[in-house]
A protein has these predicted regions:
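N-terminal Rossmann-fold NAD(P) dinucleotide-binding loop
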Residues: 14-15
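Glycine-rich FAD pyrophosphate-binding loop
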Residues: 22-42
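Conserved S-adenosyl-L-methionine
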Residues: 9-11
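Conserved N-terminal helical subregion
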Residues: 1-5, 49-148
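Conserved N-terminal glycine-rich FAD pyrophosphate-binding loop of Rossmann-like flavoproteins
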Residues: 35-55
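Conserved hydrophobic helix-helix packing surfaces used for dimerization/oligomerization
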Residues: 5-7, 28
C-alpha cells in the first residue's frame, strides 16, 4: 500500500480527496470536527468537470438519484421575461451532466462512499485538528476530542 494519509475535514473537499487518495492506493483516515455530520447548507451546482471526477469514483448512480441534471441557465427580468439563456451539461455538448443539488446531500453521498470504500473505522468524527508539526520525514497531528 502507499502512504498513510490523514485528511483533516469531512466536508466535500476532504471526502473527495479521501476517495481519490484511497483509489491511488494510500491508507487514508478522515478526521472530522463534528460528532454527527448532518445535511447542512444550500443548493450548489456541480459543473461537468467535477461530475466527471465523481463518476470516476463510482458515484454516478448516487448523484443521478440525489440531484437534478441542469440543462439550461436562464437570466430573467423581475417580471419573468427571459434576458439570456445558455445550455448546460449534456445539453451544451459536455460528456458529463451538470447537476444541481443540496450541498449537504452531496456531503452525505460522499461520506457514505468513503465509509464503504475505506471502512467506517477510517472516518473519525468528533476530532478537531488543533495543530501539527512537520519535518523532512513525517507530520505529527494533534487533535482535540470533541465527542462529548
Amino acid at each position: 500500500m502507499g502512504r498513510s494519509v490523514l485528511v483533516a475535514g469531512g466536508g466535500i473537499g476532504g471526502l473527495s480527496a479521501a476517495l481519490c487518495l484511497h483509489r491511488a492506493g494510500h491508507e487514508v483516515t478522515v478526521f472530522e470536527t463534528v460528532s454527527e455530520p448532518r445535511e447542512l447548507g444550500v443548493g450548489i451546482n456541480l459543473l461537468p468537470h467535477s461530475v466527471r471526477v465523481l463518476h470516476d469514483l463510482g458515484l454516478e448512480a448516487e448523484l443521478a438519484a440525489a440531484a437534478v441534471a441542469t440543462s439550461e441557465l436562464r437570466f430573467c427580468s423581475d417580471d419573468g421575461v427571459m434576458i439570456w439563456s445558455e445550455p448546460r451539461g449534456l445539453a451544451a455538448g459536455n460528456p458529463w451532466p451538470q447537476y444541481s443539488m443540496h450541498r449537504g446531500r452531496l456531503q452525505m453521498v460522499l461520506l457514505e462512499a468513503v465509509r464503504r470504500a475505506l471502512g467506517s473505522d477510517r472516518v473519525l468524527t468528533g476530532h478537531h485538528l488543533d495543530g501539527f508539526e512537520q519535518d523532512a520525514d513525517r507530520v505529527v497531528a494533534r487533535f482535540v476530542d470533541r465527542r462529548s
